[in-house]
C-alpha cells in the first residue's frame, strides 16, 4: 500500500505535482496498491486563488467556504464545487485509462470537523459524498475506484455514514502515540466497533496511522485490520512512532503481505480460485483435473484442426507457457504423461 495525496488538484490550481502520473508509474512498475486521499482546497471568496482545506479553528491558513452553499445550485460555491469535481475526475480518468484501480478516500476525517467538508455536520457532508460518488461513477464513468469511508466510533458516527451502496471499505485514522512514545496497541475495541457498525458487511482498514500495531497485539486481540498506511516522514521513520524492530517484525511476518508477496492483481481471479491454478493443471487439456493420454489425444486433434479449445483448455494446453500452443507443447505433454504413469 502506498498513500498518495491529490491535494494539488482543483479547478484553479496553478501547480501540478503529477500525482496522477506518479500513481500510474508506481502501480504499473511495482504492482502495488495505491491509496489516494484528497485534501480538497477551496477559496473563501469568489474568484480567489487562495485555497485551503482547514477551517479557522484548526489552522491559521483556513477557508470559510460553506459546504451547504456549495450544494445549492446557482451559487459561486457550487460552481467551484462542480468545477473541482470535473478536475479530479479528469485526473482519476488518467488512472482508469492506464488500467490502474485505486483505494479512493475522499472527504476523510469529516467528523473531526477540522476540514470544511465536515464543518457543518453530517447531513451536508453525506450529501456531498453521495454527489461525488454519483458524479465520478455515473457521470464520468470511473469504475476503477474502491471507495473508502473514513469513520470513527463516537455515538454520533452512524449519523455520518453515507450508506452501504456508496462505501466499499470502512477506514479509521489512528494517531495515538503519546509523550514521544509509540503506541503498539491493536485498538481492537475500535476495530470491532467499526466491523459491527456495518453488521460485518464491510472490511475495516487502518487507512492512516502513526504507530503500526505490534504483531503480538494484532494476533492476541484478533484485530484483523485489512491494511495499515503510516503517514509520511517521521511518522514511519522515527523511533517515537515506529521502532525499527517493530517494523522488521511485522513486515517479515506471515501476517503481513509485503509488496514482493503481492500477486499480480490485474491477473488475479475474481472468483476466489487460485491464481496459479492454470500452472498446477498444465496439460489438463480436457479439464478433468488429470493429465493423461486423453489430453494428448485431444491436443493432437486440436493441432490437426479437428477440434477447437475453450480459453481455459487452451491455457492448459500451453504447457511451456510461451503463449502459443504447438508441437512443443505436445512433446512436453507426452513427457509429462510418462512421468505421471
Protein language model regions, located:
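Substrate-binding cleft of secreted/luminal carbohydrate-active enzymes
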Residues: 202-276
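Aromatic-lined carbohydrate-recognition surfaces of secreted/lumenal glycan-active proteins
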Residues: 105-107, 111, 129-156, 201-212
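Alpha-helical scaffolding within the catalytic cores
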Residues: 18-21, 87-91, 150-162, 185-194, ...
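Aromatic- and acid-rich polysaccharide-binding/catalytic face
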Residues: 2, 157-181, 230-231
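Cellulosome-associated attachment modules in secreted, modular CAZymes
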Residues: 276-341
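Loop/turn elements at helix/coil->beta-strand transitions in domains of secreted/extracellular proteins
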Residues: 29-34, 97-103, 140-146, 165-168, ...
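The substrate-binding groove and active-site-proximal loops of carbohydrate-active enzymes
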Residues: 5-13, 68-82, 119-122, 171-182, ...
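Substrate-binding cleft of extracellular glycoside hydrolase catalytic domains
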Residues: 12-15, 19-131, 138, 142
Amino acid at each position: 500500500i502506498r498513500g498518495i495525496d491529490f491535494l494539488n488538484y482543483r479547478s484553479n490550481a496553478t501547480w501540478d505535482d503529477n500525482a496522477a502520473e506518479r500513481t500510474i508509474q508506481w502501480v504499473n512498475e511495482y504492482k502495488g496498491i495505491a491509496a489516494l486521499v484528497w485534501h480538497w482546497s477551496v477559496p473563501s471568496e469568489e474568484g480567489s486563488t487562495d485555497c485551503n482545506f482547514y477551517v479557522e479553528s484548526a489552522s491559521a491558513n483556513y477557508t470559510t467556504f460553506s459546504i451547504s452553499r456549495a450544494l445549492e445550485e446557482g451559487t459561486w460555491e457550487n460552481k467551484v464545487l462542480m468545477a473541482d469535481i470535473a478536475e479530479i475526475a479528469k485526473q482519476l480518468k488518467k488512472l482508469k485509462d492506464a488500467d490502474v484501480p485505486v483505494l479512493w478516500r475522499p472527504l476523510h476525517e469529516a467528523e473531526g470537523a477540522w476540514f470544511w467538508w465536515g464543518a457543518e455536520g453530517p447531513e451536508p457532508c453525506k450529501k456531498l459524498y453521495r454527489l461525488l460518488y454519483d458524479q465520478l461513477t455515473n457521470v464520468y464513468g470511473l469504475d476503477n475506484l474502491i471507495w473508502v469511508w473514513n469513520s470513527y466510533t463516537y455515538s454520533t458516527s452512524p449519523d455520518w455514514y453515507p450508506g452501504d451502496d456508496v462505501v466499499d471499505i470502512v477506514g479509521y485514522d489512528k494517531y495515538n502515540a503519546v509523550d514521544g512514545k509509540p503506541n503498539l496497541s491493536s485498538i481492537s475495541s475500535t476495530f470491532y466497533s467499526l466491523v459491527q457498525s456495518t453488521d460485518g458487511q464491510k472490511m475495516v482498514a487502518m487507512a492512516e496511522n502513526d504507530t503500526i500495531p505490534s504483531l503480538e497485539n494484532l494476533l492476541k486481540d484478533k484485530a484483523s485490520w485489512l491494511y495499515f498506511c503510516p503517514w509520511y516522514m517521521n511518522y514511519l521513520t522515527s523511533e517515537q512512532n515506529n521502532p525499527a524492530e517493530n517494523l522488521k517484525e511485522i513486515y517479515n511476518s506471515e501476517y503481513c503481505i509485503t509488496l514482493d508477496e503481492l500477486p499480480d492483481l490485474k491477473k488475479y481471479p475474481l472468483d476466489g480460485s487460485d491464481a496459479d491454478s492454470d500452472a498446477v493443471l498444465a496439460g489438463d487439456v480436457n479439464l478433468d483435473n488429470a493429465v493423461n493420454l486423453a489430453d494428448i489425444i485431444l491436443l493432437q486433434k486440436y493441432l490437426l484442426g479437428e477440434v477447437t479449445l475453450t480459453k481455459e483448455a487452451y491455457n492448459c494446453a500451453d504447457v511451456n507457457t510461451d503463449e502459443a500452443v504447438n508441437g512443443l507443447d505436445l512433446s512436453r505433454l507426452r513427457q509429462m504423461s510418462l512421468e505421471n504413469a
